Amino acid sequence: MGNLVIAVDGPAGAGKSTIAKIVAKKLNINYIDTGAMYRAVTYKCLKSGIDVNNEKEVIQIAENSDIDFKDNNIYLDKEVINEEIRTIEVSNNVSNVAKIKEVRQLMVEVQRKIGMKNSVILDGRDIGSYVFPDADYKFFLVATPEERGNRRYKELCNKGYNTTLEEVIEDIIRRDEIDSNREFAPLVKANDALEIDTTGKTIEEVVEEVVSKINL
């Protein structure tokens, strides 16, 4: 059997990363968090004092960044940045970086190279619709903004961030708007993707639903 490619798409907070990680372990295949790649570029921009709305400078940062995945870690220029890319500041700015066409093209190139070498499950916004339109399996996870906001809020509180549920939900809705309306490779459900509403479901229930659809 050749390499297996599984695409998991959906808006912020729908549970893509959590579900994809567990499915990857169950199927013993590699997991690629494509959103983390855009977060890495965003983090580097913020760390370098670059305005994320300055497309030219953001593209330069992306071109000069070495992003890699190994043993469930994401590396930026040879350093592990798992926690650094999960801050509120990065979350609030990542959609502005991810909407830049040239940045997406650079990241997609890396994603496709990884997918050609190994069996993978990738999660993101445009995996099934653009990065791997011929993926073997495509899933599109959704949930209400309130449910997604609640999940993100709990996650941030556990990390010690001082924010409100209202602010988190507002940010989720704002990111949906940017992701869905960007010109290049927007957040969209592929025609042949299976939509799963994760609202009110446990992680185990969603994982079981995904795994049950995959024939190895």
UniProtKB/Swiss-Prot annotation:
Keywords for this protein: ATP-binding, Cytoplasm, Kinase, Nucleotide-binding, Transferase
Keyword Ribosomal protein among UniProt keywords: no
GO cellular component: a single term: cytosol
Enzyme class, broadest EC rank: transferase
Keyword Cell inner membrane: no
Domain of life, per lineage: Bacteria
NCBIfam families xref list: cmk (TIGR00017)
UniProt subcellular location: Cytoplasm
UniProt source species: Clostridioides difficile (strain 630) (Peptoclostridium difficile)
GO BP terms in the entry: nucleobase-containing small molecule interconversion; pyrimidine nucleotide metabolic process
Major location category of this protein: cytoplasm
UniProt cross-references to HAMAP family, sorted A to Z: Cytidyl_kinase_type1
Family designation: Belongs to the cytidylate kinase family. Type 1 subfamily.
Gene3D superfamilies the UniProt entry points to: P-loop containing nucleotide triphosphate hydrolases
Record-linked PANTHER family: CYTIDYLATE KINASE, CYTIDYLATE KINASE/PANTOATE-BETA-ALANINE LIGASE
Listed EC numbers: 2.7.4.25
Name of the molecule in the record: Cytidylate kinase
